Structure formats: structure tokens, C-alpha cells
Amino acid sequence: MLIKVCGLTRQADVDLAASFGASMCGFIFHPVSPRCVSPVQAASLESGSMLRVGVFVEQDAEEICRIMAEARLDMAQLHGRQDAACARAVGAQRVIRVIWPARYCHRALLYNELQNHADACACYLLDAGLAGGGSGVRLDWEDLNHLPSPRPWLLAGGLSAENVGLALSRCSPDGVDFNSGVEDAPGQKNAQKLAAALAVAAKQKGNRYLS
């Protein structure tokens, strides 16, 4: 099971994520986000063996690559209108493509969208709402049950210790993404909430892993 903790801004929280078994740590590079960090700030946060993920909303491929190098990132989570060409310019195996299932009125349309990006990403992140992230809004998990995804996918959207077990029983993601559900305030993780959430997630077995 891939476990990602996103919206990190403090070394203490990065250390907590690593100690509780997270495999990925996320840094947000969107100026309007209360969890936004600069490339210099992200670079200063030591993350051990966790994969370092940058969240990008408005940047183009050139800017994404520049920030990735400066912030020592392994992967780019494309959270905006970046198209497949942008993803390929960044490097498909370095891309997490965000998809919002609520935009699609039928599972077939969602599946088509997944297929459209299959050769331009390493995995998907399925988030709640119609855009953005970190809102705490949950997905309808049962709608994602037996989703025929061509790539591994992570579930996001208001996950916490209280609901992640139920979420994983309703659908079968290859990973989970925690953010607002393990915080006291935006960018400030709560050690108890984080430990409890990751303990539940760590008991689950994902189907696939990033190559």
C-alpha cells in the first residue's frame, strides 16, 4: 500500500510521516494554498527514503522541471490543466495525474479519462470535488469499487483514521493520500491523527506498486 502524506511544511511533520511508515511526502507549490512552500523551503526538508512529490497547479513543464530540480523532487503531481504533452515533457514515469471522478456522470467516462492519460503518468490520484484539493471533501468510495484502472491509483479526499478503513473496504486503491484529515491547521499535522491514520492504512495490501 502506497501511503502519501501531503501538504507538508515543517521538518517535524516530515519526520513523523517517515517514522509512521509513509512512502511518499508531498509539497505544494501553489501560491494561493495555505500549505504552499517555496522550492528552497522544500529542499531544506529532509525526507529520508520517502519519495518526494511536488504538487503543481498552474506551472508549465519548464517551470515544473526547474522546481523539481531545485526542491529535490522525485515526482510531480499535476493538479491543474496540464495536458498529456506537459506530462511527457516532465517525464511520464515522474508524473502523478490527478483525476476528479465527480466530473464524470458515468464510470465509462471516468475510465476513458484514465485511458487518455495512461501513457503520460506513472499513477493516478483520484480526488474529491471538481478541482483543487485539501478541502476535506470525501469521494463516494463505492463508485470506485472494481475500477479498471490502467495504472496504480491513490485515493484522496478527507481521509483520516476515522474513515480510511471504511474507504479501503469500499474500493481497492493501490495507495492513499492524507492531508487535511490529519491536521490541526493547514500545513500543521497532528502527530496522533497521523499515527492513527497511517496505522490503519499500513494494514492494507495494495495491488500494485510504482515501478
UniProtKB/Swiss-Prot annotation:
EC numbers, comma separated: 5.3.1.24
Key words, A-Z: Amino-acid biosynthesis, Aromatic amino acid biosynthesis, Isomerase, Tryptophan biosynthesis
Family annotation (InterPro entries): Aldolase_TIM (IPR013785), PRAI_dom (IPR001240), RibuloseP-bd_barrel (IPR011060), TrpF_fam (IPR044643)
Enzyme class: isomerase
Molecular function terms, GO-annotated: phosphoribosylanthranilate isomerase activity
Superkingdom of origin organism: Bacteria
Pathway where this protein functions: Amino-acid biosynthesis; L-tryptophan biosynthesis; L-tryptophan from chorismate: step 3/5
Any GO BP: L-tryptophan biosynthetic process
Catalysis: reaction(s): N-(5-phospho-beta-D-ribosyl)anthranilate = 1-(2-carboxyphenylamino)-1-deoxy-D-ribulose 5-phosphate
PANTHER family: N-(5'-PHOSPHORIBOSYL)ANTHRANILATE ISOMERASE (PTHR42894:SF1)
Family named by the database record: Belongs to the TrpF family.
Name of this chain's protein: N-(5'-phosphoribosyl)anthranilate isomerase
Protein's organism: Desulfovibrio desulfuricans (strain ATCC 27774 / DSM 6949 / MB)
